[in-house]
Amino acid sequence: MKFTKAEARKRRHFRVRQKVVGTAERPRLNVFKSNTNFYAQIIDDTKGVTLVSASTLKMDLKSKSNTLAAQKVAEEIAKKALAANITQVVFDRNGYLYHGKIKAFAETARENGLKF
């Protein structure tokens, strides 16, 4: 049985989520990309609460999902996380390959003060 790209991503995401858990001390930084937008949120899995979120929906980059938009979202989420006293996170790439937009997001978040 041949898998589509979406099915393969879902299987990778399921495998990764079994291992990656966000705690209060080190919450999970989750990313999601659609065809039109890029989203990121920092989640405390023990409480099941989103602590900080950012996306291209709330920025001047509405309906952009390129590497520039991913970098802007990374800057925004890093700024919000540092304001909320969050410096260390666990990166959950949501089954996406560490390439392109995801890589640009991760590197920019690291440059802006998040540690993972």
Swiss-Prot record:
Write out the GO cellular component annotations: cytosolic large ribosomal subunit
**Is rRNA-binding found in the keyword set?**
yes
Show the disulfide pairing: none
Where are its TM segments located?
A: none
Query: What GO biological process, any one, is recorded here?
Result: translation
Instruction: Give UniProt keywords alphabetically.
Output: Ribonucleoprotein, Ribosomal protein, RNA-binding, rRNA-binding
The UniProt entry, under Gene3D superfamilies, shows: 3.30.420.100
Alphabetical list of InterPro entries matching this protein: Ribosomal_uL18_bac-type, Ribosomal_uL18_bac/euk
Q: Which Pfam families match?
A: Ribosomal_L18p (PF00861)
User: A single GO molecular function, which one?
Assistant: structural constituent of ribosome
Q: How does it assemble?
A: Part of the 50S ribosomal subunit; part of the 5S rRNA/L5/L18/L25 subcomplex. Contacts the 5S and 23S rRNAs.
UniProt xrefs under NCBIfam families: L18_bact
Instruction: State the similarity comment.
Output: Belongs to the universal ribosomal protein uL18 family.
Q: What's this protein's function?
A: This is one of the proteins that bind and probably mediate the attachment of the 5S RNA into the large ribosomal subunit, where it forms part of the central protuberance.
The protein's name: Large ribosomal subunit protein uL18
- What is the species of this protein? Mycoplasma mycoides subsp. mycoides SC (strain CCUG 32753 / NCTC 10114 / PG1)
Upper classification of the organism:
Bacteria, Bacillati, Mycoplasmatota, Mollicutes, Mycoplasmataceae
